C-alpha cells in the first residue's frame, strides 16, 4: 500500500499523511511507514495546523483551497486528504526536497 492513490477517474488524488505541527518551517520531509510526513510551522490550536496543511497542499498542487478536503484526522496527526482536479501528481510534494 502506498501513501497516495487515485480515484476512479484520476481527477481525485487521495493522500495519507503524518503531520508534525510546531516545526520551524512547513515542508514535506519523506515517507514514514505508509504515510508522507509533513512538518507544519503552525501550532495545532484552533484548526491552525489544518489550515496550514490545506494551504501548503493547495499551493503545491496549484489548486484552490476548496479543492483540498480533509477526509479523516481533523484532530489527529494521521490524516487522509483528498485533492480534486490537480494537474500535478504527488511528486510535486518532493520538489523542494530535491532542490536542497
From Swiss-Prot:
Pfam families: DUF167 (PF02594). One of its GO terms (cellular component) is cytoplasm. Belongs to the UPF0235 family. HAMAP family: UPF0235. This is UPF0235 protein NE0395. The lineage of its organism: Bacteria, Pseudomonadati, Pseudomonadota, Betaproteobacteria, Nitrosomonadales.
